[in-house]
Amino acid sequence: MDFKLTAAQEALRLRARELADGTFRARAAGWDATEQYPWDNVKDLVRAGFMGLTIPREHGGAGASILDVLLVVEEIARVCGVTARIVVEGSLGVVGALAAYGSEAQKRRYFPWVLDGDKPAIAITEPEAGSAATDLVTRADEAPEGYAITGEKRWITGAGTSRLYLVYCRINRSFFCSRGGVGKPSSTPRLFRAS
């Protein structure tokens, strides 16, 4: 088996290294000191095509492999961990689940968000279950307008920034939640509407 990178992978890694060294390195300490979300870095990730790397070409992405994502992440993580994490969350996790299990309508709606710089989030951790998926108690039950989610999640990386969430629940079917529409809190505590 040949473990050498292809010419395209070497070029991708070089582009990521140049962006990291030429732009992100100078900003990293400032983002850490102020604990602010690095929106300027996200804009640069979008311009470089590093958001949604694994999104299929037919949906506007690069159709990149996980190895391609890791090459980009490795170069960026050398200088700015938070920006590297944004590449991970914008190319794996929710994006992979949506590509594998989402409807065409969901893909058309949500992939552009990621490609434009919206980093998705995964909501799995619960007060009593931690991140043990087998112990989750949050439920999603069918409701007149979609689903009603009952339960509590904690420690959601990007919860204050993300619009697209993959919420782990006990359910017979799957769906995606977006902040401000799907997943919007209702008047009942810990009850969310979803469709």
Language model regions located:
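A short, Trp-centered hydrophobic/proline-enriched beta-strand micro-motif
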Residues: 116-125
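Intrinsic disorder at enzyme termini
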Residues: 1-11
